[in-house]
C-alpha cells in the first residue's frame, strides 16, 4: 500500500466530527481493546491540560500505536470515532499517526480544517451557514469574510492579528501532539530527546515574539502574571464549539483564580511554585525515591521543564505538582470554578485556542521567569565558550528590496470549512494575516585556519529599544531575541560568503497541506521532513515592525560544528526542517548547545562591544510595515 493510499484512508477519520451523532456505535460491538475508553462524554470540550482527559487520551493513543498493522489501526480508529469524545479522538489519532512507523509520510490534516469553529469567530460561522442555505447548487462558491472580535476600545485588540493567527494557533496544537505530556518512552519505545527543554524554549520564544509585536504596535511589554490573587483582565473569544453547542466562555474583567473542587486549589499552585523556586536556589530537586538530582548546566533545564509542565518525565509530580497544566485549567474555568452554571471553559483549556487570550502570554512569561531563575544560577558564558578560533564574520547584510530593510504587510488567505462542518459544498472564509517579503542573508566570513571548517550558523533578531524609546541593555535585550534560523555551513580556507533564504528557516514550516491537497496526494511523501507541520508559521517569521520602520538588531554567530552536532543526526532525519522548536523525529536534538545559546544565560557585558567576539556580527536592520500589498 502506498503512502497516498494510506493518506486517503486516514482523511475520512477527521471529516465532519462536529456533526457526529452521540454514541453512534453499540459498545457491545466494539473491539475489546476499546472497552475502557469513552469515559469523557461526547460534546465536552477536551483539554490536554486536564489530567483526567489526558489519561483517557493516553490510553487511546497507546492502543492505536500498538495496533498490529495499518489495517488494524484504521479498524480501531474507525470504531473509536463513534465511541470517544470528538476532541479526544482527534488528539489521540493524531499522536498515533505521527509516531507509528507504518504511517511514515502520512500527514495529519490541518486542525483548522478539522475544527474550523476553534479558529473562526461564531459570527462568521453563522454567516457561512446562512450563505450555504441560500445557494442553489453545491457547485456554487461560498466565500465569507472573517468578522473582527474586538475594537479600538480594547488596546489589546491591536494584537489580534498575532493572537488569532490561524497558523500560530495550529502550531501550538501541533507541537503538543508531537510532544504529549504523557509520553512514556517505556511504552512507546521511542525517547523524546530534551523534551523538557523544548517545552521551555518553544514557549519562551513565543513570548519573545509576542513582546516584539507589542512594541511594534505601540504597546508596552506584557506584565507577567505573578500573583495567584491578582484580578485578571477581561477577554471574549467570540468562538462557539459546534460539538457542544455552547460558547467558549468569556472572562469578565476583575475575576481572580479560585479553587477547583474536583481538580486543584490555589494554595496548591502557590505551594508548587515555592517548592520549584526553593529547589532552584539549592541546586537540586528531590525525586520520587527521595534522591537529590542536581540541576546542572547540561540536564537541569530538561529536568525543570518536565517538572513545570508537568509531564510523565517529572521526577516527582507528587511534590512539585502540575503548575503549568493546572494554571491553564484554572484560568479556563475562572468564570465557573465549581461548574454550577454548566458553562464551557474558556480558550485557555485548549492548545488550539489558548494563544487567542492575552493571559496566555502573561502566564507563560510567569512560567518562563521560573526557568530564568534557574538560568541565573548558571555561570555566564566566558569568551572561550563563545569564540570560534580562526573564524571571523567580516560583514552581514539582509538582501531585500532595500538593503537591511524587511517589509511586512497584511495578506489575504482563505480557509476551507466544509471538511469540518457539513455544508452543501465548499465554503471558504477569507481572512488576513501578517506576512513579509522574502529576504536573503549574506554573511561574509574569513577562515584563517588554513583548513576547511564546519560551522553552525545561528541567527537571531531583537528590538533595540523599549516602549519608551530607551536603548535596551544587552542582558535585558536577550529575552527579546527571537531565533530566525540555525544551519550548517562549510567554510573553505580564506574568504567565504554564506547565503541563506528566509524561507529555509529552521524555525518555520513552509506550507501545511490542505484536505484537498492531501486527497490529491500532494504533500504526501515518505521522506517529508517537517515534523510534521509542527513549525512556527513562515508568515510570522519576523515581527510586524512600524510604518516608519522599527529598529532591530540581527545577530549572527558561527560556532564550531564539530563541537555542536550530535552524531546520530545525519541531516536527513524524517521531520527535521523546523528543528529549532520541534526537534527531529526519532532522533536526538541535533545541537549540543543550550537552546537559545548564547542568549539563554545572564550576560554581564553592558555593551555589544564587550560581549562580541570575532565570530559574531550585530547588524542594524529595520522592519517596515506596509499595511497591505
From Swiss-Prot:
Disulfide bonds: 534-582
Any single Gene Ontology cellular-component annotation: extracellular region
Compartments reported by the entry: Secreted, Extracellular space
Keyword terms: Copper, Disulfide bond, Glycoprotein, Metal-binding, Oxygen transport, Secreted, Transport
Chain segments carrying region Disordered: 503-522
Polar residues: compositionally biased ranges: 503-513
Binding site for Cu cation 1: 172, 176, 203
Glycan-bearing residues: 395, 447, 527, 615
Principal subcellular localisation of the protein: secreted
InterPro entries according to UniProt: Di-copper_centre_dom_sf, Hemocyanin/hexamerin, Hemocyanin/hexamerin_mid_dom, Hemocyanin_C, Hemocyanin_C_sf, Hemocyanin_N, Hemocyanin_N_sf, Ig_E-set
Residues annotated to bind Cu cation 2: 324, 328, 364
Keyword flag Repressor: no
Known tissue expression: Hemolymph.
The protein's role, per its UniProt record: Hemocyanins are copper-containing oxygen carriers occurring freely dissolved in the hemolymph of many mollusks and arthropods.
Family: Belongs to the tyrosinase family. Hemocyanin subfamily.
Misc remark: The two copper ions bound each have 3 nitrogen ligands (presumably contributed by His residues) and share a bridging ligand (possibly contributed by a Tyr residue) in addition to binding oxygen.
Stored PANTHER family: FAT-BODY PROTEIN 1-RELATED (PTHR11511:SF5), LARVAL STORAGE PROTEIN/PHENOLOXIDASE (PTHR11511)
Subunit structure, interactors included: Tarantula hemocyanin is a 24-chain polymer with seven different chains identified.
Name recorded for this polypeptide: Hemocyanin F chain
The organism of origin for this protein: Aphonopelma sp. (American tarantula)
